[in-house]
A protein has these predicted regions:
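An N-terminal assembly and electron-transfer interface module characteristic of large anaerobic redox
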Residues: 1-210
Length: 210
């Protein structure tokens, strides 16, 4: 386009303004993050009424096997971020320290551990879990954090151990993780008390690739 042509530049300006207006309207129609989170946590907190299971899972853990069985995944790390954003973290961290946890520990872990004992935080605590799923591909803290919560709620804990792969992965690592996925599915079956729906898992897996 010749930028010295006033007519052409005006046409481009009108077009870009129109596109920006359409995009603005699209965002206004979309539900806000607050709305989405409200629906999500309402669904999770009503799980006992609707007969569904709740799993607390690390943010890097494989969530598709849970969703395929109708289990509602809940993320304590996200909850820790919400507590911090709501400026409620200091008090909960101090409570965790009074319980014997070092102030050197991750503030997300401290605030979540303390929150579980008082149903505090911005949403009155997370819904009680039926199981915990911990994958160590995110950090080392989650291992002891989730062990602590599993003991507190007296629920089963599954730990998925993933090898560090800095430059691709070896076949041995793939087989090792795959064998754990088989154990993970058996774990979910045991907690849910029903056979696994592999057809639904295939559907959920395909959606994750979109």
């Amino acid at each position: 386009m010749n930028q010295s042509d006033p007519g052409a530049m005006k046409t481009l300006g009108v077009y870009l303004f129109g596109q920006a207006k359409k995009l603005s309207l699209k965002f206004k129609k979309a539900p806000t993050m607050k709305d989405l989170m409200m629906v999500y946590y309402s669904e999770a907190k009503s799980a006992k009424v609707t007969g569904r299971k709740v799993a607390w899972i690390t943010s890097g853990g494989p969530v598709e096997p849970l969703i395929a069985m109708g289990v509602i995944p809940v993320y304590p790390e996200n909850h820790g971020a919400m507590i911090g954003a709501s400026k409620m973290g200091a008090g909960l961290c101090e409570k965790a320290e009074a319980m014997g946890y070092s102030n050197d520990l991750c503030s997300y872990a401290r605030s979540d551990i303390a929150c579980a004992t008082v149903n505090g935080g911005p949403i009155g605590g997370l819904p009680r879990p039926d199981m915990l799923v911990c994958c160590n591909n995110i950090c080392g803290t989650v291992l002891k954090w989730y062990e602590t919560q599993a003991r507190y709620f007296n629920v089963p804990l599954f730990i998925l151990d993933t090898p560090f792969c800095h430059t691709g992965y070896f076949e041995e690592a793939a087989r090792y993780v795959r064998s754990q996925i088989d154990e993970y599915i058996q774990f979910i079956e045991d907690v849910c008390g029903k056979k696994y729906d592999f057809e639904r898992l295939r559907e959920v897996g395909l959606l994750s690739f979109e």
